């Protein structure tokens, strides 16, 4: 893989229905969004920018010497927010922008690097993302776990919340009568989508003009809009599942408990 320069952008919305003020939640003495940015700085990114619609988040970033860009508050998605950043920063069309989720303070810097490199190495694709094999049957049947199937060139054929592909021989009526956790794993690995994306800046600027796709609206998966309009998505398959992000107070407690171990490895 080629590790050419790229920019990491971290969208951070203050509003959260399940965890209010999530970007500012304290993790080891610093706001979560700052912890995410610090992890991104450990990657090969030439620049790390937090994109937020909240002055309080931008101020917190600047207090910790993290670059922040204030964006509009009416964006329908994180990708729309990235599109504004690409325009504000006047990024060249061939620039690679990695969308690092603002609620993943334990993200591996190598994953950021590898997704950027994967897009660089797939000139026919506008987007790159990642996936890993699912090893628990319950996850295959969990609609909150997004699955992806690939073609021979490691490009996405489809993303879905449904079990994908459907293992006809393994999931007989008798097997489906069992609890999801006890159903057999199919012979073909089922891949779980990892929510990190690399984009070409030219595509980001086009994205807000793309009409929403019926499949996107049905599945509530934003990446399906790009595929609906003919864009290709390169998928990096990794053996390791990334650390889970923070969506709830319970997630936050888990991450805080894990943080001391991370600090002992990486330093403060």
UniProtKB/Swiss-Prot annotation:
Enzyme nomenclature, EC number: 2.7.7.38
SUPFAM superfamilies noted in UniProt: Nucleotide-diphospho-sugar transferases
One GO MF term: 3-deoxy-manno-octulosonate cytidylyltransferase activity
Matches recorded under InterPro entries: Cytidylyl_trans, KdsB, Nucleotide-diphossugar_trans
GO biological process entries: CMP-keto-3-deoxy-D-manno-octulosonic acid biosynthetic process; lipopolysaccharide biosynthetic process
Keywords from the named record: Cytoplasm, Lipopolysaccharide biosynthesis, Nucleotidyltransferase, Transferase
Catalytic activity: 3-deoxy-alpha-D-manno-oct-2-ulosonate + CTP = CMP-3-deoxy-beta-D-manno-octulosonate + diphosphate
Pfam family, one: CTP_transf_3
Record's GO cellular component terms: cytosol
Pathway it works in: Nucleotide-sugar biosynthesis; CMP-3-deoxy-D-manno-octulosonate biosynthesis; CMP-3-deoxy-D-manno-octulosonate from 3-deoxy-D-manno-octulosonate and CTP: step 1/1; Bacterial outer membrane biogenesis; lipopolysaccharide biosynthesis
The keyword Chloroplast appears for this protein: no
Keyword NAD: no
Domain of life the protein comes from: Bacteria
Cellular compartment(s): Cytoplasm
Known role: Activates KDO (a required 8-carbon sugar) for incorporation into bacterial lipopolysaccharide in Gram-negative bacteria.
UniProt similarity note: Belongs to the KdsB family.
Protein name: 3-deoxy-manno-octulosonate cytidylyltransferase
Organism of derivation: Ralstonia nicotianae (strain ATCC BAA-1114 / GMI1000) (Ralstonia solanacearum)
Gene from which this protein is expressed: kdsB
